[in-house]
């Protein structure tokens, strides 16, 4: 197994509009993708992405991230997820209020209820809690047919 590539770092943005403005200032341009920026019901994201040649910076107002969350690229997200679980990680999934819960402890409302894997345009995503308590995101790129 080679060294994983860091794909994305997602930051919490409790004040979504202020977060987008701050990161736009950092990059000197607006996000390459952004939801409407309007407050949305629980479980629906205000989300923005800033892309660089090597890394994506994401902002989310959902409660599933309260500290920066690193996503690594995985060629096969299900295999990588299983490997991490076999080494002591815990699979997480998104529940109704937009937060994360251990699979099997609450109904998963976004993604596969058995694995927590979510498909979004261009990627499959999963989050695990590593044995040391830190969260790690996994991302598998998918072809996009626009």
Task: Place the predicted regions along the sequence by residue.
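Residue-level structural signal for beta-strand termini and adjacent loop
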Residues: 37, 62-63, 97, 141
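Short, charged/polar, Gly/Pro-enriched secondary-structure boundary elements
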Residues: 54-58, 133-135
